[in-house]
């Protein structure tokens, strides 16, 4: 019966929300800094025979043959953190302010189904989950390597996943995000996080976590990166750069991403330092990992799965590990994105830092990131006034989840 239900769900999903076809097969695909050249459909001897009747491939066949297999393998190895249910309750804050900050649906669910606290983040945790996905894939690059694919280094993979288990003791659990959000960002349990609060929580939790050690540089809700401030965060006692996650909270327009920033936004996912983008959908956050032409590929956290136990030894079952990945492609046109987002880059050493700055400065179009020697530099350079007209600093008062 269960198998029949799953089959029915897949059939309904196919017609209601079909997977995208590669309708720009001549364009390369990028996934977190890796380029996948256009794939060539298999040759058909009948196509060279004028006497043979023409055959039109069906949608399923076209979809199977036109996405590069290497890209599908890479996409399917990106860690996907979604809504979870039945985890250890997150206590509710019983104040009028906390209650009013929740949506009606979350308020009713918490009162009727979770009177002792939140045992699921469905309806309010998608920005946290997108931020967790960005951070988890940052650790994947650091600990497993950018060339890692599923089926390799299973023990190390499991230990990485355990850090994001839905339990108060896990270093990067939703429980700890919510606690830090309440302490440092004024976010109540059950309240939507925005990119700014999520970035701040990532920074605080990374600072408190000794293994693996990761430094985090925040731009404090602007698109400006200051080299002296970055050095203060990234340099060790010997003056060498340690692995540092740069988180840029920005707004690239008013209601939609301004076309002048399309090139810069696409390019951000082609840099080898890219670890993705969190946010970017009206009233819903996603985790963007790839780009092709004017479309971005993303992982959608709006699927509720059973919570995983915290196992520091990393002994997870295959089924539990599988719940952190998906092979289902999703994409969106840049014009349909929400302009508020959190953009992440991982700089591992001096060469990475020099290469990243060079790429930022040479990207065509209106820049989405500005690099300056110092915050106290009196003149931010030509074009700064125009940039301020379009790129707005994030304000949690109008952030989306």
From Swiss-Prot:
GO CC term, one of those recorded: nucleus
Superkingdom per UniProt: Eukaryota
One Pfam family, short name: Peptidase_C54
Locations listed in the record: Cytoplasm; Nucleus; Preautophagosomal structure
Keyword Cell membrane attributed: no
Keywords linked to the UniProt accession: Autophagy, Cytoplasm, Hydrolase, Nucleus, Protease, Protein transport, Thiol protease, Transport
Main location as per UniProt: cytoplasm
Residue ranges, annotated region (Disordered): 37-65
GO molecular function: cysteine-type endopeptidase activity; protein-phosphatidylethanolamide deconjugating activity
Enzyme class, first EC level, given as a word: hydrolase
Biological process (GO), any one: protein processing
Reaction(s) catalysed (UniProt annotation): [protein]-C-terminal L-amino acid-glycyl-phosphatidylethanolamide + H2O = [protein]-C-terminal L-amino acid-glycine + a 1,2-diacyl-sn-glycero-3-phosphoethanolamine
EC number assigned by the record: 3.4.22.-
Keyword Secreted: no
Biased composition (Polar residues): 45-65
Active site: 126 (nucleophile), 300, 302
Function recorded in the entry: Cysteine protease that plays a key role in cytoplasm to vacuole transport (Cvt) and autophagy by mediating both proteolytic activation and delipidation of ATG8. Required for selective autophagic degradation of the nucleus (nucleophagy) as well as for mitophagy which contributes to regulate mitochondrial quantity and quality by eliminating the mitochondria to a basal level to fulfill cellular energy requirements and preventing excess ROS production. The protease activity is required for proteolytic activation of ATG8: cleaves the C-terminal amino acid of ATG8 to reveal a C-terminal glycine.
Sequence similarity: Belongs to the peptidase C54 family.
Protein name (Swiss-Prot/TrEMBL): Probable cysteine protease atg4
Source organism of this protein record: Penicillium rubens (strain ATCC 28089 / DSM 1075 / NRRL 1951 / Wisconsin 54-1255)
């Amino acid at each position: 019966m269960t198998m029949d239900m799953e089959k029915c769900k897949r059939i309904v999903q196919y017609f209601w929300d079909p997977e995208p076809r590669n309708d720009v097969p001549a364009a390369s695909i990028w996934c977190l800094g890796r380029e996948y050249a256009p794939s060539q459909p298999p040759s058909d001897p009948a196509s060279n025979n004028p006497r043979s009747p023409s055959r039109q491939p069906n949608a399923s066949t076209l979809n199977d043959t036109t996405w590069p297999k290497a890209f599908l393998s890479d996409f399917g190895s990106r860690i996907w953190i979604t809504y979870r249910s039945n985890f250890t309750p997150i206590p509710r804050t019983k104040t009028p302010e906390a209650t009013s900050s929740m949506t009606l649906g979350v308020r009713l669910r918490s009162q009727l189904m979770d009177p002792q606290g939140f045992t699921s983040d469905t309806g309010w945790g998608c920005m946290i989950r997108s931020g967790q996905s960005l951070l988890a894939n940052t650790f994947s690059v650091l600990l497993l390597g950018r060339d890692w694919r599923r089926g390799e280094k299973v023990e190390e993979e499991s230990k990485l996943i355990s850090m994001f288990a839905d339990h108060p003791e896990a270093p990067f659990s939703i429980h700890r995000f919510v606690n830090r959000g309440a302490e440092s960002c004024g976010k109540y349990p059950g309240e939507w996080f925005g990119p700014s609060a999520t970035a701040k929580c990532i920074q605080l939790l990374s600072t408190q976590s000794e293994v693996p050690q990761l430094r985090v540089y925040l731009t404090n809700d602007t698109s400006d990166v200051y080299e002296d401030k970055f050095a203060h965060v990234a340099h060790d006692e010997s003056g060498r750069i340690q692995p540092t996650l740069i988180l840029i909270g920005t707004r690239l327009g008013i209601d939609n991403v301004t076309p002048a920033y399309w090139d810069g936004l696409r390019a951000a996912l082609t840099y080898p330092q890219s670890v993705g983008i969190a946010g970017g959908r009206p009233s819903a956050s996603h985790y963007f990992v790839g780009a092709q032409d004017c479309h971005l590929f993303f992982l959608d956290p709006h699927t509720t799965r059973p919570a995983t136990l915290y196992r520091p030894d990393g002994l997870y079952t295959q089924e539990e590990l599988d719940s952190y990945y998906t092979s289902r492609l999703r994409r969106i046109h840049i014009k349909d994105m929400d302009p508020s987002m959190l953009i992440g880059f991982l700089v591992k050493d001096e060469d990475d830092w020099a290469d990243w700055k060079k790429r930022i400065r040479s990207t065509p179009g209106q820049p989405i990131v500005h690099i300056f020697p110092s915050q106290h530099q009196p003149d931010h350079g030509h074009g700064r006034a125009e940039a301020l007209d379009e790129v707005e600093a994030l304000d949690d008062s109008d952030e989306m989840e």
